Curated annotation (Swiss-Prot):
Role description: One of several proteins that assist in the late maturation steps of the functional core of the 30S ribosomal subunit. Associates with free 30S ribosomal subunits (but not with 30S subunits that are part of 70S ribosomes or polysomes). Required for efficient processing of 16S rRNA. May interact with the 5'-terminal helix region of 16S rRNA.
Subunit composition and interactions: Monomer. Binds 30S ribosomal subunits, but not 50S ribosomal subunits or 70S ribosomes.
Annotated region (Disordered), positions in chain: 125-175
Name of encoding gene: rbfA
Organism from which the protein derives: Pseudarthrobacter chlorophenolicus (strain ATCC 700700 / DSM 12829 / CIP 107037 / JCM 12360 / KCTC 9906 / NCIMB 13794 / A6) (Arthrobacter chlorophenolicus)
Compositionally biased residues, Acidic residues: 140-165
Family of this protein: Belongs to the RbfA family.
UniProt-recorded name of the protein: Ribosome-binding factor A
GO cellular component labels: cytosol
Keyword Cytoplasm: yes
Coiled-coil region: none
Keywords: Cytoplasm, Ribosome biogenesis
Amino acid sequence: MADPARAAKLAQRIKVVVAEALGRKVKDPRLEGVTVTDARVTNDLQHATVYYTVFGDETAHADAAKGLEKAKGVLRQEVGRNITVRLTPTLEFVADQIPVVASNLEELLREARKRDAEVAALAATAKHAGEADPYKSDAPEDVDIDEDDFDEEDIDLAGDDDIDEDANKDADSSK
């Protein structure tokens, strides 16, 4: 097992070598619109997966896949010359799905912006369901209510006859 950092460096180097070889060595017209986007190498450095995109329609994608399979031997030979490992890894070419996913995300974002604009338009013309200040007091505004303005007749704690102090004294003396 190789170090993951070494595998990542090797994958990066394979990506560059394959991209350069597609531009210089391979003269297949089916591979003109091919762009190498990424490469991954297994930890044992025996297999490399090269991801690519193709500019064009579905027939261009199918032609590019056939062209890459046909050029696999030449590309592997070029990779073997330009990297320093004991065994040259086998190459596998996989069409990259990032452009498809990106276009789907752009469509979803476009739809979200459209819905946000609709909600903003509704919010601009909307009115509150109740009054502007739902916590408004029912008391007239010219009356000043002060909590310290209670009279002694309103609350008479001094003359409270409900408290039986003698019962408390009897309970303490029985102990």
